[in-house]
Amino acid sequence: MLDKLQPLRGMKDLLPDDYKVHDYIINKARDVGVLYGYKQMSTPILEYTKVFNRSMGESSDIISKEIYSFLDKSNESVALRPEFTAGIIRSFISNNLRHKLPLKFFSTGPIFRYDRPQAGRQRQFHQLNYEYIGAKGAMTDAETLKLAVDILKALEIEQDTTLELNSLGCSESRSVYQQKLVEYLNDFKNQLSEESRVRLIKNPMRILDSKNEIDQKIVAAAPILSEYYTDESKEYFEDLIKYLNILGVKYRINPRLVRGLDYYCHTAFEFTTLKLGTQSTILAGGRYDGLAKIMGNNDDMPAIGFAAGIERIALMREYNVSLLSLVVVLPIGKNNICYALEIVDKLRTKNIATIIEPTGKIAKRMQRVLNENAKFIIFIGDEEQANNNLKLKDLETQEEYILDFAKTLELLKKY
C-alpha cells in the first residue's frame, strides 16, 4: 500500500473556504492602495539567489538560515523568494523604470522561508506588499504609514494593533551609534547568546531585537540610537511625527526597533498585536534608500515600503465572507435535463452564479444543495418545462414562486 501523500512540512493547501478569506483580504487591501495611487505588479517567484544575497547580505537570518535556494538544471543558483522588496527593486532596475518615477507598486503572492512551523508562521505563506519608489522626505513616510492604517481599518483589525515607530537616522548617525553599541556590548560578550555573539561581529544592531531573555536584559541598558542623531536625522523624525499627528495616526515610539540591514535608514515601523501570542507582528516596513545602489543602480534611490502577512491577518478575526448568491438548478427527471441546461446557461450569461444537480435521488441532491449554501433552488419538472416556467424556492424564507424566465431573472438580480 502506498504511503498517504501529504504536503511538505510548513506548507498548507488553501481550500475554498481559506481562499475565500484570502481573496477578501487581498481585495480590501488592493482597493485601499488604489486610493493612494498604487498599481499592481508581480515578479517571478523564482529569482537568482544573488538577488537576495546582495540585498539582504549573507549574514542575515533569512539568507543564512531560511532561504530555499538550489542549483537548477543549468547549474545556476536560484531561490524561491523570501520577501518581495528585492525582486521589485531588481525589476525596477532591469526594466529601466527610472524615468517613470515616482512609482507605487502593490504585490501579493506566496513567500517561502525555511522556518520552524507554528501558528501564524509557515514555510510557505502569503503577503500583501507595498513599495513606494522615488519617495522623498518624511511626508511620504507619513503617507505610507497612513496607508497601512487605512488597510488595517478596512480589514477591521486596526483597533487591535499598535504602531511601533522608530527612526534609524542617517548613515552617519548609525555609524557613530553602532560604534558606541559595540563598545557597550563588548563588556557583556561572554553573557550574550551564541547568536548575538555572531551578530556582534557581523551586524550588532540586530542584537537589539534578540528574543533571548539574557540578551534583552543586557540590551535594556544599552545606548539609544536617538542620542546620536545628526541635526538632519533629528529634523527628519520631528517632521514625520508632525505629519503623523496631522493625519491622526496613533503611534508608540520604540527606541529598540531596528532594521538590521545597511540600506535601511530613517523610518522603521511595525504594527503589532497581543492577539497572536509570539507571532505579534502583523505588518512591518521601513525606508530603504540604499537598496537600489546595492543592487546595481547608479545611485541611491529614495524608497519606503511594507509587507503584511495574510495568514496572520486571517487569524485576527472571523471573516464571514459571503459568496455570490448561488442558484442551484435541479431537473426532476432525465427528460428535464436539456431544458435545465438551457436555463443554467442563460442564467450564467446574465452573471448569475449557477450550478446544476442533474443526477441521483432527489433527497441526496437536496442535501448537496444545502451543503453548497445556496440561496435559491430552481426545480424543473415536466409541468414547468411544458409551460416554459420555473419553480423557484428561496432557501432562507422557504417561499416558492412559479415564474417565467424573465421574472425569475428579475427576482434573482435583487440579490
UniProtKB/Swiss-Prot annotation:
Reactions it catalyzes: tRNA(His) + L-histidine + ATP = L-histidyl-tRNA(His) + AMP + diphosphate + H(+)
E.C. designation(s): 6.1.1.21
One Pfam family cited in the UniProt record for this chain: tRNA-synt_His
Gene Ontology terms describing biological process: histidyl-tRNA aminoacylation
GO molecular function, one term: ATP binding
Record keywords, A-Z: Aminoacyl-tRNA synthetase, ATP-binding, Cytoplasm, Ligase, Nucleotide-binding, Protein biosynthesis
Enzyme class: ligase
Source organism, top-level taxon: Bacteria
Subcellular location: Cytoplasm
One GO term describing the cellular component: cytoplasm
PROSITE patterns listed in its UniProt record: AA_TRNA_LIGASE_II
Gene3D superfamilies registered for this protein in UniProt: Anticodon-binding domain (3.40.50.800), Bira Bifunctional Protein, Domain 2 (3.30.930.10)
Major place of residence: cytoplasm
Family under the similarity heading: Belongs to the class-II aminoacyl-tRNA synthetase family.
Subunit composition and interactions: Homodimer.
Protein name stated in the entry: Histidine--tRNA ligase
Organism field: Rickettsia canadensis (strain McKiel)
